[in-house]
Amino acid sequence: MARRRLVTGPPDFVGVGAQRCGTTWWFRTLLRHRRIVAPHGRQKELHFFDRFSAQPMRDEDVEAYHALFQRRPRQLAGEWTPRYMFDPATPPLLRRAAPETKLIVMLRDPIERLRSGFAHRVARVPQGSKEFNAIDAIERGRFATQLERLYRSFEPERVLVLQYERCRRDGVGEYQRTLRFLGLPDHRRPKRLERARGTTTTGRKLALWPDMDEALHAALDPEVGRLRDLVPDLDLALWPNFAHLG
């Protein structure tokens, strides 16, 4: 019997955020489903739209994006570039390239996300703590601002917002919830999922800077308060740094 021909077209889903929130783990989890495929070479992050900060996106660029997503009939193809939600220019470009796509967002306690980024930087760069850009790290944790911006390009019902902490606690349930959002059957219900790696610090929590806690809450408490309104099922009990807002 002849093999079914591969087809190309806009991605069926795109993960757009957020950095240091377990997105690599969750993308790999999704790829366990026989009907979900990654771009050629199983690459997770395409960063396709980054280039258009310096040049306009043309129709041929849109076609080139579509060509990256090859799948057989009934398969779903997608990518996950966590920077897309953070970059203000990307959501309108993504809307133009894939107006019918479904978006997935994975969020995490913003202070723990910052701490994870700090640990990642320290591990990779000598004297990394001195080079860590705290202002940029705080901006990347302004999830309400980013989600509001995303909703200006995509209807909220096209966006699934997950909590990293909930996915760790109830991985099977959140995996099935994600499949339902994508319109897929549950496949073989896994008894457990692979544990998340690379998103937590080991041992005691890394210290940041003296008196930084107050500055972080001043910047991020209002964001989390607005995020609670944008995501009604957000469970702040899973974010101890912000449980006082619940």
Predicted regions: what they are:
Residues G22-T23, Y65, G78, L94, ...:
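Generic structural signal for small/hydrophobic residues in well-ordered secondary structure
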Residues R42-K44, E148-D229, D233-G246:
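The conserved 3'-phosphoadenosine-5'-phosphosulfate
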Residues D87-V105, A144-T145, Y151:
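ATP-dependent NMP and nucleoside kinases share a basic, alpha-helical "lid"
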Residues T90-P91, R115-A119, V172-Y175:
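Short aromatic-enriched loop/helix-cap "lid" or pocket-rim segments at secondary-structure transitions
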